[in-house]
UniProtKB/Swiss-Prot annotation:
Keyword Oxidoreductase: no
Paired cysteines (S-S): 4-18, 8-20, 13-25
GO biological process, one term: defense response
Entry's family note: Belongs to the cyclotide family. Bracelet subfamily.
Keywords attached to this entry: Disulfide bond, Knottin, Plant defense
The protein's name in its UniProt record: Cyclotide vodo I1
Length: 28
């Protein structure tokens, strides 16, 4: 649930432990 400070166009994020949800990277 914490925003990782990165937008994403695909399912993966460049920041480790973060996942793409609704176009933005979140971690827990």
């Amino acid at each position: 649930g914490v925003f990782c400070g990165e937008a994403c166009a695909q399912a993966s994020c460049s920041i480790a432990g973060c996942e793409c949800i609704a176009g933005l990277c979140y971690k827990n």
